[in-house]
């Protein structure tokens, strides 16, 4: 059995990239495939902003930025934002939308490992939202994010827990019953238990600050943050000061 990890320059699942490339043109359609991302973005932004003590004047990196939903919203808060993604089409959509919106965001097509090799300790805040479950080596991504943040800076991760409930909610429910996201968006085998993510964090300069769940109520069709990390969750970490 081949146990070699992908090289840092190729920590990419091309099937995952292809899935998002295929629907990239509809990234900013509020009623399209990315409607859930638009719906949860105010919650993500609020969490990041509050726990970072505000984003104004800060240098921010959004890892796995896709079409730029979170990146643009952080730029609107006054941050200097760089968006990183390996999908060409999503980045083209992001660049065009930023231009049309009058928002300045720098978008770069490269892996986070490649970016870390050139920009170590250059960011006040690093975000990595709904990206870890789409790469072959999420541990490598966590390590790279830790390298990119300044001492004392903030790093945020969000992903999906791996258990029966998350499979029912995120795959069966969201993809096949409610059709909130396209079928095949998620692979439960790639979901990440909080203990696994925290073990990778502990290998770096990062320290856990707070963890919260992201919950969907199908009856009220609303999202909220709160206790319980059995499906979607967000983790706030902080780099040790020099």
UniProtKB/Swiss-Prot annotation:
BP GO terms, sorted: methylation
Pathway membership: Cofactor biosynthesis; ubiquinone biosynthesis
Enzyme nomenclature, EC number: 2.1.1.222, 2.1.1.64
Matches recorded under InterPro entries: SAM-dependent_MTases_sf, UbiG_MeTrfase
Keywords: Methyltransferase, S-adenosyl-L-methionine, Transferase, Ubiquinone biosynthesis
Coiled-coil zones: none
Keyword Transferase: yes
UniProt keyword Methyltransferase, yes or no: yes
Reactions it catalyzes: a 3-demethylubiquinol + S-adenosyl-L-methionine = a ubiquinol + S-adenosyl-L-homocysteine + H(+); a 3-(all-trans-polyprenyl)benzene-1,2-diol + S-adenosyl-L-methionine = a 2-methoxy-6-(all-trans-polyprenyl)phenol + S-adenosyl-L-homocysteine + H(+)
GO molecular function: 2-polyprenyl-6-hydroxyphenol methylase activity; 3-demethylubiquinol 3-O-methyltransferase activity; methyltransferase activity; polyprenyldihydroxybenzoate methyltransferase activity
A Pfam family that the UniProt record links to this protein: Methyltransf_23
List of residues binding S-adenosyl-L-methionine: 44, 64, 85, 129
SUPFAM superfamilies registered for this protein in UniProt: S-adenosyl-L-methionine-dependent methyltransferases
PANTHER family cross-referenced by the UniProt entry: METHYLTRANSFERASE, UBIQUINONE BIOSYNTHESIS O-METHYLTRANSFERASE, MITOCHONDRIAL
Family listed: Belongs to the methyltransferase superfamily. UbiG/COQ3 family.
Protein task: O-methyltransferase that catalyzes the 2 O-methylation steps in the ubiquinone biosynthetic pathway.
HAMAP family: UbiG
Protein name: Ubiquinone biosynthesis O-methyltransferase
Gene that this polypeptide is encoded by: ubiG
């Amino acid at each position: 059995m081949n146990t070699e990890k992908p090289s840092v320059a190729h920590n990419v699942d091309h099937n995952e990239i292809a899935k998002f490339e295929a629907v990239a043109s509809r990234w900013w359609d509020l009623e399209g495939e990315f409607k859930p991302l638009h719906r949860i973005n105010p919650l993500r932004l609020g969490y990041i902003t509050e726990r970072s003590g505000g984003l104004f004047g800060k240098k921010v990196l959004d890892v796995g930025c896709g079409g730029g939903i979170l990146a643009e919203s952080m730029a609107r808060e006054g941050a200097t934002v760089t968006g990183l993604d390996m999908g060409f089409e999503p980045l083209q959509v992001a660049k065009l939308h930023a231009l049309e919106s009058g928002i300045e965001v720098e978008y770069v097509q490269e892996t986070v490992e490649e970016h870390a090799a050139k920009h170590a300790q250059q960011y006040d805040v690093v975000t990595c939202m709904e990206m870890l479950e789409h790469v072959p080596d999420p541990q490598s991504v966590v390590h790279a994010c830790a390298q990119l943040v300044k001492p004392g800076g903030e790093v945020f991760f969000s992903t999906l827990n791996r258990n029966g409930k998350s499979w029912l909610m995120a795959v069966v429910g969201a993809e096949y019953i409610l059709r909130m996201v396209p079928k095949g968006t998620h692979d439960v085998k790639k979901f990440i238990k909080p203990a696994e993510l925290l073990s990778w964090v502990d290998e770096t300069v990062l320290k856990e600050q707070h963890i919260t769940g992201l919950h969907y109520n199908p009856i009220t069709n609303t999202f909220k943050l709160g206790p319980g990390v059995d499906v979607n969750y967000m983790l706030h970490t902080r780099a040790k000061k020099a």
